[in-house]
Amino acid sequence: MSPVSRSRPNEDTLGSQKRRRFSESPPSALQTSRSPRGGGFGSLLSGPEGLQPPRGAQGVRPLHPISRPRSGERPLPLGIRTLACSSSPICGGYRYHHNYAGDPSWAEDQEKEKEESYRQRRLKERERIGELGAPEVWGLSPKIPEPDSDEHTPAEDEVKNQKSSSSDFTNEEKRTKTSHSTKKKRKKKPSKRKHKKYYDSSSDCHSSSDSDKKKVKTKKKEKKKKHRAKQLKKKRTKKEYNDISCKASERDLPEDAWMEQSMSAESMDLIGPEAPVIHTSQDEKPLNYGHALLPGEGAAMAEYVKAGKRIPRRGEIGLTSEEIASFECSGYVMSGSRHRRMEAVRLRKENQIYSADEKRALASFNQEERRKRENKILASFREMVYRKTKGKDDK
């Protein structure tokens, strides 16, 4: 333990000498004395015995203190001690004097902090603009909106004034009615109160008058019953009188008059000779021209077929059939595949119309043939009937 106590004054003297050197040395010397690993001033302040605290920081303890060798332990070599001291950030005043000039992570952190502060500033400014607005940019909105020329025309203003005046008039009428009704109610209320008071005071008088009221009611009921019975008798007598008068008039009128009236009523229904019954032909009925046709297209095409004309095609309106035929002969057609497709559609539609027209012609022909057969059969039957009746008459 005696060698340890002897070495303490030597350590104090060495630390004071090193502090003086550090304070007296120029900045160029300090920069050159930094270790290549970024350890700072560890090589200047680190001694063989251990680390010394920097000037002005007596209370700060080193992060990695090097303990003295105890009894029975081997002390560390000098190079390892200096490296350990130089690697610590607080050793030799490194924490207080180094500016991180060559550290890229420190520069990135500084830039991030600046960006974050700028964002916060911009956010606060935007919130302020959203709340208060920016009159230097947009200007303040007008307190009273300007009247629009389309919305506020003089005619509309007059109509609005009339409506407002009529509504005011109706409101005044309602108010007067309500005031009258309230006055009447107020007038009625005291009368009820008076009546109640009178009723309470003269309860005995009312008990005596109740019997009189009942008698009056019974008399009124009897009168009503008698009146109803008289009315029923009058109605019965009127009905009987009417029946008797009708019977007497029937007896007086002859039967010929009734026959003439019925005949005249029957003749009034139909005036003039009856029209002959005409069988509706199939030509008048709407014919189905097939599917995939526009409404009215089939009928319009059938009209051209009936007239014996060529059905006009798309783009041929205003041209005669002869002009169209001459154009087709000279080689004017639609362009390419579209012409082929349009031609196919046109041919299909025309075939539908022609087939429908042929069906109609066949149906009309069959109908005419049937009518002819029926007429022949009817004529032969009439001749046969006439012969038989004539032979009987001769006998």
Swiss-Prot record:
Gene Ontology cellular-component annotations: nucleus
Comp. bias (Polar residues): 25-35
GO BP, one annotated term: cell differentiation
Amino acid composition bias (Basic and acidic residues), ranges on this chain: 109-130, 150-161
Compartments where found: Nucleus
Comp. bias intervals (Basic residues): 177-197, 214-238
Domain of life: Eukaryota
InterPro entries for this protein: NKAP, NKAP_C
Phosphoserine modifications at: 23, 25, 149
Entry-linked PANTHER family: NF-KAPPA B ACTIVATING PROTEIN, NKAP-LIKE PROTEIN
Assembly and binders: Interacts with RBPJ, CIR1 and HDAC3.
Function summary: Transcriptional repressor of Notch-mediated signaling. Required for spermatogenesis.
Protein's name according to its UniProt entry: NKAP-like protein
